[in-house]
Amino acid sequence: MPRSTKKGPFFDHHLIKKVESAAGSKRPIKTCSRRSVILPQMVGHTIAIHNGKNYYPVVINENMVGHKLGEFSITRVFKGHGGDKKSGK
């Protein structure tokens, strides 16, 4: 169920402050706030999103606006389904 439109998008205020202060910087902005919605002010910035173990840099473009940061940094590694347990005779 999506968030109510009258509430508006959720974002952490400390993240917006970091984006505004890093206007001309090329360094990635580190954040653990996977729940924040990508706003138009973030377009063009590189944000390093924490996945629980590492920070993965993601360059924000216009198509990502409205999505959450966590959608672009996967947390689980799929190693395939279990193979056939029979020996290959």
From Swiss-Prot:
GO molecular-function terms, A-Z: rRNA binding; structural constituent of ribosome
InterPro entries attached to this UniProt entry: Ribosomal_uS19, Ribosomal_uS19_bac-type, Ribosomal_uS19_CS, Ribosomal_uS19_SF
Keywords linked to the UniProt accession: Ribonucleoprotein, Ribosomal protein, RNA-binding, rRNA-binding
GO cellular component: cytoplasm; small ribosomal subunit
GO biological process, one term: translation
Similarity-based family: Belongs to the universal ribosomal protein uS19 family.
Function according to Swiss-Prot or TrEMBL: Protein S19 forms a complex with S13 that binds strongly to the 16S ribosomal RNA.
Name of the protein in question: Small ribosomal subunit protein uS19
Organism from which the protein derives: Xylella fastidiosa (strain 9a5c)
Gene behind the chain: rpsS
